[in-house]
Amino acid sequence: MPRPRKTRTVRTDLAVHFYKPQGIPLRDLQSVTLSLDGLEALRLADVEGLEHAAGADSMGISRPTFSRLLTEARTTVATALVEGWAIHIDGGPVAQGPALDGSACPNRRQRRGPCARRGAAGALARQTGDEPPSSPTDNEKDD
């Protein structure tokens, strides 16, 4: 008997669950299902630009599992685009994680990933393009 799938943390809040070619009724289209964890892997790797290890850490899964999810999601989206199919986003063993509003590090363990060595200020700086405040140097302290 296989072991149960590990729950994956997803921080994507969906407003839309279907994508389809314009002008064709959904009932006339073939559709493919993109899992929520696959969509999250796409978001982390392709939108946020995270490396596989950081994306896996953010989702609470192993790096090989993240890579497998990403490959499956890219294949699903590419097939739907090339064939003109609808994409239904749903399912998967997921748990809704905290929103990425820049107030905290996206992964709770700040050892790896986007907050490595810089803490939450570093993550916010990368999102906004600003540098985090630096500590004063010894020369500035003497003034």
Curated annotation (Swiss-Prot):
InterPro entries: UPF0251 (IPR002852)
Pfam families, per the entry: DUF134
Ranges of Low complexity composition bias in the record: 116-126
Domain of life from the UniProt record: Bacteria
Disordered: annotated segments: 100-143
Entries under PANTHER family matching the protein: PTHR37478, UPF0251 PROTEIN TK0562
Annotated family: Belongs to the UPF0251 family.
Name of this protein: UPF0251 protein Rru_A1194
